[in-house]
Amino acid sequence: MNPHVDDKRAVILIGHGSRAAGADDDMEKIAAGLREKSGGIVETCRMSGRGISFTKAFERCVGRGAEEIIVLPYFLHFGIHLREDIPEILRTAARRRPEIRLVLGRHLGYDDALVNLLAKRIGESEGLCDVRKITPAPIDRRMKDTPEEKQP
């Protein structure tokens, strides 16, 4: 498969984003893979307000000559961000830049490839230790409801 992305047609991956260091790395790796596969313009942005905003990613694509931008939601579930928030963000951008064709692609959702990936993860889990033997990482400690540290 060779996705058609070039100097006139760009892709923006839009994800939720996270405050946890390194949590967004996988989306960046996916974007890098798409860039390598297509040789075209591929940007990322996040809904969380951390990292690059959609507006910034959109303007980067336009600044590089894109006339069409495909926005691919990096989400598994068809929740509020996909039903309401992202379409509104795109409508705002389309009003601001009517000369740019703006397309909202499908979210990750269901795909047989995802079933195969989960089956692979089940296989990889064989031989891993029980969770009771894992020392909590600093972020895991925040999830405990103790008198010293309440859940956020």
Over which residues does each language-model region extend?
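Active-site-proximal alpha-helix that buttresses catalytic centers in soluble enzyme cores
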Residues: 1-152
